[in-house]
Amino acid sequence: HRGRMEIRVDVKGISCHGSAPERGDNAIYKMADILQNIRSLNENGDGPSNEIKGLVKMLNPEFNPVHAEDAQFLGRGTCTVSQIFYTSPSRCAVADSCAISVDRRMTAGETWDFCLKEIEALPAVQKYKDDVKVSMYMYDRPSWTGEVYETECFFPTWINKESAAHVQALADAHKALWGEARIGHADADPKYDAMHLRNRPLIDKWTFSTNCVSIQGRYGIPCVGFGTGAESQAHAPNEITWKQDLLT
């Protein structure tokens, strides 16, 4: 599946009394412009009319000549703002700093350096260039022993061919145990429940991320994900797994 990284954008401003905001330089207003650019980066197309080429561009061999085929399978990268922070002397003062966290999902052909430079090149970031810092988060949380092993918050994209030996081994084991038919849901409405009519095992990709981005993506140890349910339920409110997906 796709890789991921965690990006931080910091913006500096100058505080002043809220009764005369023109004396200061509001960091939140600067960040507002950057937020719109990041939204455009995620949502825009890659046509000539787009000043900011959207992340969908990596599905196009023109922008991703080596890895476009794998990117088309995995799906385009995405970015979303997940956190926002600010500092201000009080509720009656201009904010002198603002920061955001960006959750960046990466398709084939994208690297951490590529993603950082992509943010740095945004028009609003260039506009406020001297007051903006774009960086990658680091994991530095102590382990249960107290040891701190600082690691970049970057985990590479990884992909296996369906013909890979370890993929076929799992598929063969699944067929030997349960056959190729979906358990239950034979009367499912294909308009709303097409996945339940597909034979199993279904060999595909995931949109979300798992520890395999570290095991295979970072360390090159062959991996395969296996599980029940629908990925649309992951981290969803009232997350469920259908009884038909469980062996009882």
Model-derived regions, located:
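Metal-dependent amide/peptide-bond hydrolase catalytic core
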Residues: R2-L247
